[in-house]
Each structure stands twice: as C-alpha cells, then as structure tokens.
C-alpha cells in the first residue's frame, strides 16, 4: 500500500469513528432531555384541571443516579401521595376469630424491666398495628409498683409500641395520661390524653407529635375517654368523652377533631342513660360505638355518630345475652333495644360488640360476676330483635379459671374488606391476687377469620409465686 492509500484508509477509519461518536453524543443528549422532562410528569394536572387546596404530604423522595458513558443523569421517582382514610370498604364476613398476638408482659416481668400498665388497647396505621397502654410510671420489679391499683396519678403516661413488643424501658411515652384514645387518620396519629385533678382534668389533643388543642373538665368529675381507638373518616376524627358520676347521671359529649383541632362538640342524644369507655368502629360513612353503662344496664349502649352533620343517636344492643359484667344469668337477662335493662348495672367493665346484618358478634367475661374467663359468639337477630338469645359460633378465648379484664375492638383495612379484631386485657395482681402489691396486665389479640379454627385458652400464664412482690 503506497503512502497515499495509507492516508486515505486512516482518514476513512477516523471519519467513521468520528461519525459513531457524534451519533452517540446525539443519543445521550436526547436521553438526557427526555428524562429531564419525564421527571416533571408525575401526576401533573391538565391545564384546565382544578387541584385540591389541602396540603399534600410527600412520603418519600428518592433520587436515582444513572451513569451513561461518563454522563450523569438524575431521575426523580414520582413521590407517593398519602391520603386520609375513609373506611368505605365493606365489613369482612367472618366465621369466628383466630389468634393474632400475645405480649406475655407479666411473665417477662419476672426477670426483666417491664412497665406496670393497665387499660391497654390496639390501633393500626395504614401499614402496621401498635399496642397502647397507660403506664404507672414504674416497672414491675420496683418498689414504686406498690399500690398501682389506683387509676389516676400524675405519673401515668400513654405508652406505644409495635404490636407484640412488651412495654420495655425503651418504650416511647406518647403523652401524660390516665385516660386516653388514639387513632390514625391516614396521615398522622391523633392521641387524646386526659390527666390532672379529678375535679379539673385536662384533655390534650396531640397530632403528628405536636400539641394542637386542649379542653378542660366540663362537669368537674373525672373527665375520661374511651381507653380504645378513636375513628377517623376523611380527615375528621371522633372520640367519645364523659364527665360526671360513674354511677349516676353524667355528661357525655362526642368531639370531632381535624388534624388535632376540635371543630365540633355534640351532646349525647337518644335513649342511652349512661355511657363510658366506648369501643368504636367505622361503619362508613359514619361511626358506631358499643359502650359501658355503669349505672342502670348490663346491656351495652350503642352510639351512632353521623360524621357529616355531627348528629348523634343512641340505643342499646338488642341481644338478650348481654355483654357487661356483672349481669344476670342468661336465662333471666333481658334487653329491649332501647333502654337499660336495670339488671346489675353497676359497676361494669369495658367491652365490645359489632353488628353483622341483623346479627351481632360480641365478647364478654365467662363469669357473670367477676372479670374472669372470656368468650366470643354470634347472636342471631342480636342487632335487630329484642331479647334475642340464639347463640352460635362460641369460642373460649380465656378459660373461666383465669383472670381477664377490659376488652375492646379495633379495625384493620384489607384489600377487599374491613376486618374486626379485638384485644383482651389479662389483669394480674391486686385486687384479686393479694400475695403481691402491684396491679398490671398483659394482652391477647384475635382477629376475624373466614376460615376454620380450633380451640384453646390463652390466659396471662404467669405463676404469681414467681413474681416480685
């Protein structure tokens, strides 16, 4: 090959390489421009689309780095918009309840630093469930645990842990409270925390970790609330609060809260005579609560809360198999759906039930006199027919030889329906077990199932002789 041919060949190869490089640079430029404009296409509205005025919470904002031929391109992944919960799905159809969680707090207290608690409950955010309880400002193996049978002291605080995690020393103290309720509106937690003097207590409303509002006692007689979850629909949360006599006429009010601020207060109306410690659940578009009549009735009051116009109605569960303790035996107990049955109304215990068409699912202590044992069952016609007593699908949760306590409901939203779950407080120590000076609890939790299930008993399980005095 002569020199001229070599020059021509080298020139051709160089031109080819230059052309390829030029085309690659054009491709990189096009890719860069395309990705730059795509990152602004996340949920961008049409020019004539009206955007909502409420704030939008960005849950995550991730930047992805892509390396192309020494050129850096940043691509922003579309942020996820968090919305208020509306609970519009139907209620799950169930055959009974299956075990879900048990924290074994008392057994663990025999050899570890576990809080002394009572009044536990469970509530869930859209992704995870949490257990709450009112701590006594002390662990069990501590002299401060003496005489913790008392309900209202200034050292009590609301504790919060992931469900199944006992209240250890690292547990978060959410607020100061000897009575409480908590719920998640889809964006943040609301905590209602009552503390202070019996005759002049304060309820603090804490939303997203900030104190947003408060209200003082209106009857100067132990302002108190649900001891279980409140309910939020489309950004409005509702909670039932009572101030007044525990064994006579009291003043119950239903509060409506938006992002921690009280927006309305409705008085109790309807036929319920006394209302405390309600267990509430969403019944879209409204909220329904099953409560404790501590005055006249061993049948449980029902409160229906209209979330649109703030109107309130109340009545009583129709089932003649009544849910409170103490109560008459099942042969002689009664309920006419509208009024208290005037059967062993005082004192009572927190409990739950929920409607299922004309029927009702409910839980109660097995003993008619004491807080011992726990059972669940369905009463045919128990929601619509006065004094109905046809019971099916009975399950023993805690056998009659073991202590129980308060119980309450919480709701869990699935892909197709809303499931109902409940917890049972398993009280140990005083006043029933006088070998020790403390009073505390563990919990067991069950959820509705459409499947089959077996039998068993899930008591607290601690040997009182192994426990610190």
Swiss-Prot record:
Which parts of this chain are annotated as the region Head of neuraminidase?
91-469
Q: What is this protein called?
A: Neuraminidase
Which gene name belongs to this protein?
NA
Q: List the disulfide bonds.
A: 92-417, 124-129, 183-230, 232-237, 278-291, 280-289, 318-337, 421-447
> Which positions in this protein are listed as binding Ca(2+)?
293, 297, 324
Q: Which organism is it from?
A: Influenza A virus (strain A/Korea/426/1968 H2N2)
Cofactors (names) = Ca(2+)
Q: Per the UniProt record, which residue ranges are transmembrane?
A: 10-30
- Sites binding substrate sit at 118, 152, 276-277, 292, 371
Entry annotated with the keyword Acyltransferase: no
Role description: Catalyzes the removal of terminal sialic acid residues from viral and cellular glycoconjugates. Cleaves off the terminal sialic acids on the glycosylated HA during virus budding to facilitate virus release. Additionally helps virus spread through the circulation by further removing sialic acids from the cell surface. These cleavages prevent self-aggregation and ensure the efficient spread of the progeny virus from cell to cell. Otherwise, infection would be limited to one round of replication.
* Additional free-text comment from the UniProt record: The influenza A genome consist of 8 RNA segments. Genetic variation of hemagglutinin and/or neuraminidase genes results in the emergence of new influenza strains. The mechanism of variation can be the result of point mutations or the result of genetic reassortment between segments of two different strains.
Catalytic residues (UniProt): 151, 406
Quaternary structure, per UniProt, is: Homotetramer.
**Residues exposed to the Virion surface side:** 31-469
Subcellular location as annotated? Virion membrane; Host apical cell membrane
Q: Which GO terms describe its molecular function?
A: exo-alpha-sialidase activity; metal ion binding
